[in-house]
C-alpha cells in the first residue's frame, strides 16, 4: 500500500490532458525525433491529421525539431522558433541527447541540474507568453526490457526530473518513458535492442511514430 501511495505521489502520469481546440496553434519542440516527426509518416504529421479529422479540426500543428538539440539549444532558439509563432500549446519532447551525448564525454551532455534549470526556465517563458505546455519524458536509447540498456538509469533520472517539473509547473505530461517501457514489455518478446519502435535504438520507425502520435493525442485530450 505504501509503495503504491509513493508511486502515485511521485509520478503525475494522470495529469489532466491539455485539451486541443480548433483555434489552437500547437508547436512541437524537440530534437531529431521531432524533426523526423514532421515527415510524411512522422508523429507530428499523424497528430495533425488526427486533429483535422476530429473536434479540433482547424488547429494548426507546427514541427520545431532540430537534430542534435539538447535543452541549452532549445533555450537559444525559443524566441525564434516558438514564441514568435504565437502558439497556444507547446509540446516539449527533449532529453535524449542531453543523456546520450554525455555518454563518453559528460561535457557534451547536459548535467541533471542544468537540465532541470533550463527546461524549467523554458516552461516559464512559454507560460508567461500565455501558452499551455505539455512536457514529454525522454523515450529510449535501446529497446531491451527491464533496464538492460546501458543508459536506462540515466534516462529514468531525467524522466523523473521532467515529471517533477510537470507537477511543479502545472503542465500537461506525456510520459513516453513509461509508455515505451510498457509497450516494449509486451511487444519485444525477443528482447531486441532495436526494430520494435525504433530504427536504431533512438529514432522512431513507422510503428514508433504511430505509437508516439497516439500518446501525444492522449495528452492533447484526444
Feature locations, PLM:
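Short Gly/aromatic-enriched secondary-structure transition segments
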Residues: 41-45
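A structural signal for the hydrophobic beta-strands that form the central parallel beta-sheet
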Residues: 28-29, 63, 135, 198
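Alpha-helical cap/lid subdomain in secreted, periplasmic
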Residues: 20-21, 46-57, 73-222
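A short beta-strand-loop structural module common to alpha/beta enzyme folds
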Residues: 54-70
